Design a protein with these regions (language model features):
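Short, conserved phosphate/pyrophosphate- and ester-handling motifs at nucleotide-, phospho-/glycolipid
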Residues: 35, 164, 468
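Helix-enriched interaction subdomains in cytosolic or periplasmic regions
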Residues: 318-322, 456-501
Length: 640
């Protein structure tokens, strides 16, 4: 049975007619030519197109389905791109992309050399600000609004669209605190797209607060009308002000987060009533900002499988839209995330001090099973990476041994806390850093390329890079024995398929493992010092070149004995890592060799000094010079 929604009440058009309507819109200027009563039909056409298109490319589906009417209404009412829209995170921006001239390009969404899955300034003038990480939109829109005010452009609107999940990020609250300073001086509109979801289910007291909000709009409107009537009569106006002070708690609805920042709040209103949205937004344009409009939407709206399971359809691969995502056959290999999940559950059975923390990435970080089995030793702190790390530091001070499960790209957001609250105090916090290295379709904002460089520079920090499935278990066990800060970084997806034979065994801290030893003659002797995934990627190269291959295991402490031995016994050293070359593991090797007075020629392979775009991971590895063919050629050239 076709799972696409047929219940929405819109003017009856055939699928071909809806398609024709959508194809007539190549910009918001075209959109504004439609009669407002046609907009529900357009919403249906957009959803049909999104489901068909994303089912072929993969992408963030359920969030964009939920924000369809919102995207239509914003571009219909506001003069984009002169008026600027900032889409927080960007998961919900596909309708925006389609309406702003990228309908045909959606076939290349997140593909190599295709359009980005997120708003990107270099891609379109309608993408006012690049987003992909959470909670940045209000700060960015506020900055633009202040700049325009300084430049005399006081008629330009700046709109931040932020979800209820993203509003739990501290940066968003900081921006609200700042925005309230401007009272009514700026044309700043904050749309709270409230769909009761982030990626994982919502967490924290703020989510509960949003769920209970009632509208202050009627009271606010009544107050403004009363002002206009009473102010011309001084005696009545003075009396009204005295009465207001005594009755405000009686007449006003419960205080909201926004009113506490002196920001006018309206809502909640139905985010799927597109004609109502248009009318409301037109009225708001007559006011000065900052203004918050609270819009209630349903994540996955219009496609029943996504409505029923918005988390499953948050980020999807290719699927059949007629039947929806179907259970796949049991995988032959476990992902590194699944291996981490197995390890943390097994370890928690043995060690009652283990406490798991995630900043709103329960599913992605592999903690679903842990939460089921150990709910009292688990906390999703919402989109609050900084708090997650310092919360872990506090636990560690009081005899609990915390594990912070976090993506590499999101660990960047908590760097000061890692330095100030964990490393300086030498606290036993284990960072399980998922998505380390190139992640593919999510692109430059989500690759985990900087963690080696920014972690190895910290005193007291141990940095570990498992190379395969069994090493993952061994090195997590080893990390758990430390009573100091430690980070274990591992890539997205699966490894080479090595059987996991380790149970509770550990390895010596700072000791590497020699995978093979060269028998090449002097002058042709190469030692490859590989970190993490580069070990199995270069196994065949080492065999073809008859090179020594060392699984370094530890970036810090570096196995200095192994490095000295390799330098003394080989004509060429090669380091390889799936991370930024500047300041990375190869740099650590060269720093040590320099201090030791060793001058053996060394080639460093890592990610070059550029931000890597989205695309197929293997293509990106090749473009970064990390594919076996390129590395082998460079080694052979160095030996010749």
């Amino acid at each position: 049975m076709d799972q696409r929604d047929t219940t929405q009440v819109v003017r009856m058009l055939t699928p071909d007619e809806r398609k024709e309507m959508l194809e007539s819109i190549n910009s918001p200027a075209d959109l504004r030519k439609l009669p407002v009563e046609e907009l529900p039909v357009l919403a249906r056409a957009l959803r049909d197109f999104m489901v068909e298109s994303v089912s072929k490319t993969g992408g963030h589906l359920s969030s964009s389905l939920g924000a369809t009417e919102l995207a239509i209404a914003l571009h219909y009412v506001f003069n984009t791109p002169e008026d600027a829209i900032v889409w927080d995170v960007g998961h919900q921006a596909y309708a925006h992309k389609i309406l702003t001239g990228r309908r045909d390009a959606m076939a290349t969404l997140r593909q190599t050399d295709g359009i980005s899955g997120f708003p990107k300034r270099s891609e379109s003038p309608y993408d006012a600000f690049g987003t992909a990480h959470s909670s940045t939109s209000i700060s960015a829109a506020l900055g633009m609004a202040v700049a325009d005010s300084l430049n005399g452009k006081k008629d330009r609107w700046h709109i931040a669209v932020i979800g209820d999940g993203a509003l739990t990020g501290g940066m968003a609250v900081e921006a609200l605190n700042h925005a309230g300073v401007y009272k009514k001086d700026l044309k700043l509109l904050i749309i709270l797209n409230d769909n009761d979801h982030s990626i994982s289910p919502p967490a924290g007291a703020l989510s509960g607060h949003l769920a209970k909000l009632v509208s202050t709009a009627p009271v606010w409107k009544a107050r403004e009308i009363s002002k206009s009537i009473l102010k011309p009569v001084p005696l009545l106006w003075d009396f009204a002000k005295r009465v207001e002070k005594q009755t405000v708690n009686f007449l006003s609805p419960p205080s909201t987060l926004f009113s506490s920042f002196d920001i006018n709040y309206f809502g909640p209103i139905d985010g799927h009533d597109v004609t109502g949205l248009v009318s409301f937004l037109k009225n708001l344009k007559a006011l000065d900002g900052p203004i918050v409009l609270h819009v209630k939407t349903k994540k996955g709206k219009g496609y029943k499988p996504a409505e029923d399971d918005p988390t499953l359809y948050h980020g999807v691969g290719k699927f059949d839209p007629v039947v929806g995502i179907q259970p796949s056959a049991a995988p032959t290999k476990k992902t590194y995330t699944q291996l981490f999940s197995d390890w943390i559950c097994d370890t928690a059975e043995r060690d009652k001090t283990l406490y798991a923390i995630t900043p709103a990435m329960r599913e992605g970080s592999g903690l679903v099973e842990f939460e089921k089995r150990f709910p009292e030793r688990y906390r999703d702190v919402a989109i609050a990476e900084q708090h997650a790390v310092t919360f872990a530091a506090g636990l560690a001070c009081a005899g609990i041994h915390p594990v912070v499960a976090i993506y590499s790209t999101f660990a960047q957001r908590a760097y000061d806390q890692i330095v100030h609250d964990v490393a300086i105090q030498d606290l036993p916090v284990l960072f399980a850093i998922d998505r380390a290295g190139l992640v593919g379709a999510d692109g430059r904002t989500h690759h985990g390329l900087f963690d080696i460089a920014f972690l190895r520079s910290l005193p007291n920090m141990t940095v570990i890079t498992p190379s395969d499935e069994n090493e993952m278990r061994l090195l997590l066990n080893t990390a758990w024995t430390l009573q100091t800060p430690v980070a274990v970084r591992y890539p997205r997806g699966t490894g080479p398929g090595v059987e996991v034979t380790a149970d509770t065994e550990t390895v010596e801290i700072g000791k590497s493992k020699t995978v093979r030893t060269t028998s090449a003659p002097k002058g042709k002797r190469v030692a490859i010092l590989a970190f993490g995934s580069m070990v199995w990627r270069l196994t065949e190269v080492a065999e073809v070149l008859d090179a020594t291959l060392v699984d370094m295991r530890f970036v810090k402490p570096l196995d200095e004995e192994a490095v000295l031995k390799a330098a003394a016994e080989h004509d060429l050293l090669v380091t390889a890592e799936e991370g930024i070359k500047a300041g990375g593991a190869g740099s650590a090797v060269l720093e040590f060799l320099s201090e030791a007075g060793q001058t053996t020629r060394t080639l460093i392979f890592g990610i070059p000094d550029v931000f890597i775009d989205h695309g197929d991971t293997e293509v990106l590895m090749t473009r970064s010079g990390l594919d076996p063919v390129h590395i082998r050629a460079k080694i052979e050239a160095a030996l010749s």
